Regions:
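Acidic-aromatic/histidine active-site loop/patch
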Residues: 1-28, 210
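Phosphate-binding loop that captures ATP/GTP phosphates
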Residues: 11, 63-121, 142, 184
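Phosphate-binding/switch loop-helix module in NTP-utilizing enzymes
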Residues: 104, 122-162
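Inter-motif core of Ras-like GTPase G domains
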Residues: 147-148, 161-182
């Protein structure tokens, strides 16, 4: 096993309460998608360092473990983290296929070491992330990825800090908001929800991370 994968709790401790919480999250999202299937999902946060990338990595793992083909896309073109979490290269990725038709036909997806889970890292960081998210090309990229997987998950920058997440949220089936207990200021969380509502994004739920549940429970929830 890739040593980095041991840092992903749903892989290293699949029977832990934390891993069970991620499976519960997966199930809740399935129910949220009864009216409209969540083929594409954006995961964002109100502010920085709130655990969105870790949350998304674990959600992707448990979704793949349920027998679905999952593509995890690092659309945080400012501070990409997913390639580090999985211990993979970031030389090519989302920005590569945004610029290259040949790459779009054969996306540089990387095997994560988890069956049925692939990562499309951010690739080289561009000077204009928000413009790329808003482009027609991004819609073509999403369509191409959906053809290759049962579900496509996107990691994005915090929705309050920059416009990238809000722009991408208008192009997907749903948005999951990550909030850190004891860190996210209430007004930031409120602003994040308001921004998503203003653009008519489909907010399917929120995840509270870094909750202290006592000595018998190590977890994010």
């Amino acid at each position: 096993m890739n040593e980095k994968l041991k840092e992903i709790v749903t892989i290293s401790e699949p029977r832990s309460p934390i891993s069970e919480a991620y499976r519960t999250l997966r199930t809740n999202l399935d129910f949220a998608g009864l009216a409209k299937t969540l083929k594409t999902l954006v995961v964002t946060s109100a502010g920085v360092n709130e655990g969105k990338s870790t949350t998304l990595a674990n959600l992707a793992v448990v979704t793949a473990q349920a027998g679905r083909k999952v593509i995890l896309v690092d659309a945080d073109l400012r501070r990409p983290r997913l390639h580090q979490i999985f211990g993979l290269s970031n030389e090519q990725g989302l920005t590569t296929i945004m610029m290259d038709d040949n790459a779009l036909a054969a996306p540089p997806l990387q095997e994560t070491g988890v069956e049925s889970l692939w990562l499309l890292p951010s690739g080289p960081l561009p000077p204009n992330p928000a413009e790329l998210m808003a482009s027609r090309r991004m819609e073509e990229v999403i369509a191409a990825l959906v053809e290759r997987a049962d579900q496509v998950f996107f990691d994005t920058p915090p929705v309050v800090a920059v416009t990238d997440a809000a722009v991408l949220a208008t192009k997907v089936d749903g948005v999951l908001l990550v909030i850190s207990a004891g860190k996210t200021r209430r007004e930031y969380a409120r602003t994040a929800v308001q921004r998503l509502q203003q653009i008519n994004a489909r907010l399917v739920g929120a995840v509270l991370t870094n909750v202290q549940m006592g000595a018998g429970f190590r977890g994010y929830y």
